[in-house]
C-alpha cells in the first residue's frame, strides 16, 4: 500500500518522505529480498527516502540489544526519524530555529536517498559533541559527504549559547 499512497501524494505535489527499514540479517534472505524490492518500488514515488538497516541498531545504543527488544528499538528509531522531520516545520519548545515548510521542501523535494544523523549530548561542549555524533551517525549506510542540501535542527536548553549553535552548525556544514 505504501507505494500507491506515496504515488498519489507525489502526483498531487505533496512532499513525500519515506522512512523505511531493512530487516535484521537473522530474518533471512527472502525477507531482505522483499524489503529491497519494496524499497526499489517506492524509490521513484517519493521525494526523499531514509533507509535504516536494522542490523546497525547495535551501534546506536549502549544497552544490550536482546531478541525481545530489538524490534522495539527499531520502532523507536523510526519514531525518532519521523518526529525529527516533523519538528523541522512544527513547534517544539526546545527547538532553537524552526524552519518553514518551504525550506524543508526545497531541500527534500526530488532529493532521492537522504541521510539523517541525530546527536545529543550533555555537559561541556554538548553542542559540538551532538553535532559530531549527528554527522558520523553509524545508523545509516549513507554519509553526509557529497550532500547537495542540509537541514539542521538544533534543540537545547535555554542556556545553549550562540557560540555553541554556531559551532554545531559549522561542524555539520564542513562535514
Q: Model-predicted segments: where are they?
A:
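Tubulin/FtsZ superfamily GTPase core signature
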Residues: 1-175
